[in-house]
Amino acid sequence: MKQRIKTRHMILGVMCLMYFIAYIDRVNISVAAPLIREEMGLTTSQLGLVFSAFAYPYAAMQILGGWMADKFGPKKVLIVLSLIWGVATVLTGFAGSVLILVVLRFVLGIGEGGAFPTATRAFTYWMPVAERGFAQGITHSFARLGGAITPPVVLVIVAAAGWREAFIVLGAVSLGWTLLYAFFFKDSPDKHSRVTAQELQEIGYRHGDSRQAAKAATPWRRLFRRMWLVTFVDFCYGWSLWVYLTWLPSYLKEARGFDLKQLALFTALPLMAGVVGDTLGGVLSDRIYKRTGNLRLARGAVLFVGLAGSLMFIAPMTFTADAVNAVILLSLSFFFLELTNAVLWSLPLDIAGKYAGTAGGMMNTGFGVAGMVSPVVFGYLIERTGSYDLPFMISGALLGVGALASLFINPLLTVDSPDEKAGEVRHALP
């Protein structure tokens, strides 16, 4: 007899598709950037401004989007957000000036800003504790897969029609996902007609949990105390990630001499390495937890190894003269960087439980702030020095600081547990 696919895994599949599409819409501007820059006559500083315009509302929407998901449910919130970013992507194809580009990237940031915290809130009630690392890992691996296929997809559409048409097509795909999500997703398992009593037991969901959470007051002070260090580490992680998402195609073209045809392959390689890292990081963390029962070790070990490993490969990349070797080192660095992503997104679930949407938004504010600063600083330093070396060195330094800070993160210090009893709650999970 054929085994029935669990509803939670189908929900996970829908979320994977959202992460995949969201990253295509986020990264497409960097792939089209050389053509946009040529058509509109933009400087590197102006291009950096276009890149960073996304990050300001993205950061601002993190906590707000997560809080709205906690209060109003992830279904309504994510439908509105995906409509906003889908329309913004379509309209980018009609932009005629740098100002319009900045405005539309800003609107895109509003739409995408609350999406991942909202998804994290959904996982609180749809995914059991032992599957959360995998869920965060696989969704973010689909995000990186979206980023990895963006160069060839965008360049194929560009070759056939133009860069404007690429944004119109990709925006239409985003709006199509909104329809799928609105049809299939429910805020909690007990509301879904396909979920069996056995699966409810496997998930560990109790009837009324989501309604009680919506009525509960948000413990802002305790959330901040538990999440500020996670937010800082996410900033250190995000600084380097934004470099990959915004400047990688320009770096490979201008500093390493790859032509447009080669860019499709060599831009995708580091991002594909990230796909593997994302998935493996979540699986490793879950496996360590299942074998040891030590949640702090399961999260902390993967965080430290990922950030330190990324630094280990980004440092020699700046000194190698061979372009292919540089891509290999970038790919290895990005693989280790992405090992940390699933763990970072699992921490709000571990620490905050029913407030995971707000906590996830709080954490990802660090990522958003990095997105405000990193692309602009990167572009400014390139313009001032004529080289990409110093910006990459700054990224490496932040990876080192983040690795050290990760050693002090303790997911056993939950929002509901007093500090003095943290040592007694080794197995306590939300």
Curated annotation (Swiss-Prot):
Keywords tagged on the record: Cell membrane, Membrane, Transmembrane, Transmembrane helix, Transport
Phenotype caused by lack of the gene: Mutants do not grow with sulfoacetate, but can use acetate, taurine, isethionate and sulfoacetaldehyde. Mutants are also unable to induce expression of the sau cluster.
Domain of life: Bacteria
Stretches that traverse the bilayer: 47-67, 83-103, 142-162, 165-185, 228-248, 263-283, 301-321, 327-347, 362-382, 390-410
Membrane topology: Multi-pass membrane protein
InterPro entries per the UniProt record, alphabetical: MFS, MFS_dom, MFS_Na/Anion_cotransporter, MFS_trans_sf, Sugar_P_transporter
Induction: Induced by sulfoacetate.
GO CC terms of this entry: plasma membrane
GO MF entries: transmembrane transporter activity
Cellular localization per UniProt: Cell membrane
Gene3D superfamilies in the cross-refs: MFS general substrate transporter like domains
Protein role: May transport sulfoacetate into the cell.
Family from the record: Belongs to the major facilitator superfamily.
Cross-referenced PANTHER family: FI19708P1-RELATED, SOLUTE CARRIER FAMILY 17
Protein name: Probable sulfoacetate transporter SauU
Protein source organism: Cupriavidus necator (strain ATCC 17699 / DSM 428 / KCTC 22496 / NCIMB 10442 / H16 / Stanier 337)
Lineage of the organism: Bacteria, Pseudomonadati, Pseudomonadota, Betaproteobacteria, Burkholderiales
